[in-house]
Amino acid sequence: MQTMTSRSMTGHSRFTSTPCGERCRTIARVVLAAAVMAGGFVSTEEAHAAPLMAGAAKVDITNVEAGPVNDPLFVKALVIKSDTTTALIISVDAVAIGEIGHIKNDYLPKVRSRIEKELNIKPTNVLINASHCHGVVCSDVDERTFQAVKLASQNMVAVHVGVGSGHEDRIMENRRLKLKNGREVDVRHAYSMPADEEVAEVGPVDPEIGLLRLDRADGPKAGQTLAVVYNFACHPIQGVPNGGNTADVTGFASKVIEDNLSDGTIALFVQGCGGDINPIMYKDVEHPRSAEPLGNLLGLSALKGLRKVQCKSDERLRVINETLTLPRADVAERIVAMEAEQTRLLKSLKGTSLNLKTFLPLVVKYNLSDEFPSYYSHRYLHDKKLGRDDLGKLDADNRRNMKAYMDNIYTMEELTRVQTNLALLLKHQAQNVAAGKRTIDVEVAGLRIGDLTLITFPGELTVRIGLNIKQKSPHKKTFVAGYTNGYIYYAPTAEQLLNVGGAQEDSDCILAPEWQALFEAKAAEILKKL
């Protein structure tokens, strides 16, 4: 929000001397003083609008009936108000805002409607972001969301605003692998990895932690931090050793932040463009899966950045919420091609002499000694002196049988990838046909708080899209949040959608490739308005 100020009027009169002399100058000074006292003129230094008001709260939303609980899940609310605008950020420890997981599709309209009715906050000014952790929330999550918002709105205080960045590149990796044959696959527990020698390169990550800090502006707690909003791109799906319900990486990170700032600080995580970003060492089989060390690193890196943030009085607050129409995908031809590939792979499987019991010992032997795998070397030398090569022929047979067995394994691994992603394509093709139209309408929001600008989208944006928007933004501090105000599955780049059926991001998607240019153009348009 831009503040209108009057032209500066100082105590030094700018009236020039006239024939009326000192009497006129005296009258002018009296009139000027009266106008200032009446509020008709305000100096630049005195023209500051009232500081932003803010309130923050959190409510536990853990489903305690869904099995063992490792750590709590929360819904957190941050209400920010200027003289003319009220904005609301809600962060939910859940996989999505509707469509998948345990939050139903009526959650967003129900929560917004009640907030508007009872708290008079416009639905378009309500931004609800899912952390994308895979924890299980309680059945009355909508009621508890409203409770958090109400608590926040009842405890508003004047705040100073600071914006900055942190850096963290140790806890995540791009999960899309570019193969030497030009295709791409992804790193999932749903299927196995390609052979190491097939992998050519990996995609980028975004190490920036977007930071917003709100400090109390006055009163006995002046200077203490009321709330922090931090934005980062990574799937928080590492899990915990006991397999219990967890808010995962970002839940632990938020706890680190809250425990190390002022008493009562609320840390809201806003998921970024983490569609193709996994926790580091995601498929490690040597150690228990544990999100806590990764969350601790993220939290400490956020704190390091927060220490450098300077808060100041800044009344700028604006929300822009627009509807964007995007094209739906038609993958019917790709489905036919993948079904043909599925059949080809299945028919390529051949019978082998070996089974698992005989294959594994041979693999060990032939990898321990390439030249003399079947016995000690002297037996090979002995046979050679006698003109025999019995062990050599045995080795040739064993190597041929091992290769046949390995070929079947690689084929079966490829078959599982094809079948898993084909099922996703079939699901979304049916959804798009059932929709009855070739497009889908989505919410794209822009938020400005002081020096911070934020763009939101309801899909699982991949990291390159966030990097593009940040790079082209006219503002110094722009952040991007997927998983916000709804859920429309993955939203990969147009280039990634050339790989349809090869990885989850391009298979678990309802959008046509043209969507990316439309969204990035809309984001640029909104950023200019902010």
Regions found by a protein language model. Give the residues of each.
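Charged, flexible cofactor/metal-binding loops and thiol motifs
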Residues: 299
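Short regulatory "switch" loops immediately downstream of catalytic or recognition motifs
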Residues: 1-3, 33, 37-38, 211-219
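Bacterial N-terminal signal peptides that target proteins for export
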Residues: 4-32, 43-44
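C-terminal segment of classical bacterial N-terminal signal peptides
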Residues: 37-46
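Conserved beta-alpha junction segments in alpha/beta enzyme cores
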Residues: 49-266, 272-296, 306, 312-530
